[in-house]
């Protein structure tokens, strides 16, 4: 399997991203560090993308591959809305990406993705995808990247079913903070988004700092 390929593992170094299912929406969070080997190449790397008004995605892995997929799925989401007048359902978006990735499985995109979205029929949904199109619907939480083992430890210990978005935001920050303390390839701050019935909200650095102060006061 591709997950056992040494080259794939090399590309997977760096990054921590998390997704959390809450009773009223989805929380996504990432760190901001991009690395090239042992070099910190970027301290403000964008790893959290708004796809449309009700869907966002995190990326981990090869930057060029991930950005290409962001452009593809953003264009498809826009076309879907132009044709139907509605936003593309999150599960349809995830399935489309899965098909794109599987179609390139012999020359794979070296990425891991988390998609969070909301629609009026299915509610809040969270999906994870691997490099060859493996698609999982997550019912609690997920994490990707080199810092994910530490993040998973915090999430496993503190996640509660049907937790509120407010608690989910704090848990996302706590899991990212723990990962950044232990993983040299993750760091330089946090990006945070919430997706619920009101749409996608990307939090500012000041808002994230306020949440961190609540968590660690």
UniProtKB/Swiss-Prot annotation:
GO molecular function: threonine-type endopeptidase activity
Positions of the catalytic residues: 15
Keywords assigned: Autocatalytic cleavage, Cytoplasm, Hydrolase, Protease, Proteasome, Threonine protease, Zymogen
InterPro entries associated with the record: Ntn_hydrolases_N (IPR029055), Pept_T1A_Psome_bsu_arc (IPR019983), Pept_T1A_subB (IPR000243), Proteasome_bsu_CS (IPR016050), Proteasome_sua/b (IPR001353), Proteasome_suB-type (IPR023333)
Propeptide positions: 1-14
SUPFAM superfamilies with a match to the protein in the record: N-terminal nucleophile aminohydrolases (Ntn hydrolases)
Catalyzed reactions: Cleavage of peptide bonds with very broad specificity
Main location as per UniProt: cytoplasm
Activity regulation field: The formation of the proteasomal ATPase PAN-20S proteasome complex, via the docking of the C-termini of PAN into the intersubunit pockets in the alpha-rings, triggers opening of the gate for substrate entry. Interconversion between the open-gate and close-gate conformations leads to a dynamic regulation of the 20S proteasome proteolysis activity.
Subcellular location: Cytoplasm
One GO cellular component term: proteasome core complex, beta-subunit complex
Enzyme Commission number(s) of this protein: 3.4.25.1
GO aspect biological process, one term: proteasomal protein catabolic process
Top-rank taxon, per record: Archaea
Claim: Cytoplasm is one of the keywords in the record: yes
Oligomeric and partner information: The 20S proteasome core is composed of 14 alpha and 14 beta subunits that assemble into four stacked heptameric rings, resulting in a barrel-shaped structure. The two inner rings, each composed of seven catalytic beta subunits, are sandwiched by two outer rings, each composed of seven alpha subunits. The catalytic chamber with the active sites is on the inside of the barrel. Has a gated structure, the ends of the cylinder being occluded by the N-termini of the alpha-subunits. Is capped at one or both ends by the proteasome regulatory ATPase, PAN.
Family: Belongs to the peptidase T1B family.
Function statement: Component of the proteasome core, a large protease complex with broad specificity involved in protein degradation.
HAMAP family: Proteasome_B_A
Name the UniProt record assigns to this protein: Proteasome subunit beta
């Amino acid at each position: 399997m591709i997950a056992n390929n040494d080259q794939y593992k090399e590309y997977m170094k760096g990054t921590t991203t998390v997704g959390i299912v809450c009773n009223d929406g989805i929380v996504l969070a990432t760190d901001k560090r991009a690395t090239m080997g042992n070099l910190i190449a970027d301290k403000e790397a964008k790893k959290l993308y708004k796809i449309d008004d009700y869907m966002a995605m995190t990326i981990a892995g090869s930057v060029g591959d991930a950005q290409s997929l962001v452009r593809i799925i953003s264009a498809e989401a826009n076309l879907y809305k132009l044709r139907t007048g509605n936003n593309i359902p999150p599960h349809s978006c995830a399935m489309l990406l899965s098909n794109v990735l599987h179609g390139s499985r012999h020359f794979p995109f070296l990425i891991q993705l988390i998609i969070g979205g909301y629609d009026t029929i299915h509610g809040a949904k969270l999906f994870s995808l691997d490099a060859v199109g493996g698609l999982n619907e997550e019912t609690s939480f997920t994490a990707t990247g080199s810092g994910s083992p530490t993040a998973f430890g915090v999430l496993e210990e503190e996640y509660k079913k049907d937790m509120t978005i407010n608690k989910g935001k704090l848990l996302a920050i706590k899991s990212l903070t723990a990962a950044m303390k232990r993983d040299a390839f993750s760091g330089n701050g946090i990006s945070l988004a919430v997706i619920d019935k009101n749409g996608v909200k990307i939090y500012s650095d000041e808002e994230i700092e306020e949440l961190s102060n609540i968590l660690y006061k």
